[in-house]
Amino acid sequence: HMRLVDATRGIVKAEDLARMKPSALLVNTSRAPLIEPNALVEALRAGRPGMAAVDVYEKEPLRDVSEPLLTMDNVVCTPHLGYVSRDEYEIQFTDIFDQILAYAAGTPANVVNPDVMSRRR
C-alpha cells in the first residue's frame, strides 16, 4: 500500500505500465490516483500489463456500470474492500484508538504537520 499524497499522485505513469510484461498482473487496492488518469485502462487494452485486480477507482463511489474496468475480461474488480479482514480491522481500529488517546494526553503520534501543534487552543 502507498499513501496518496501530492508526491505519490500519478506516480505510476503510462510508460511504467507499458514496460510490464503481457503476463503481468497489476494489483491496486491502495488508491486509484496513484496511477496516472486513464493510464491503466489504456495499458490493459494494449496488453501491458495483461491483467489487473483493482479495489479502487478514479471516481468513487463507483456507480457507472459502463466504467471501462468493469467491462474488461482481463480485470477483477472489488468494491473498495478487497483488503478487509478481521485482523486488518482490529489493527486499524486499535491504532486509531491509541492515536486518539495519545492526542488527548497531549502526546500525539504520527503528526504530519507538527507546526500546527504550536497553534493548539
Where are these regions (language model features)?
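Rossmann-like NAD(P)-binding element
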Residues: 1-11, 28
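Rossmann-like dinucleotide-binding domain for NAD(H)/NADP(H)
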Residues: 23-121
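Charged helix-capping and loop-helix junction motifs
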Residues: 11-15, 96
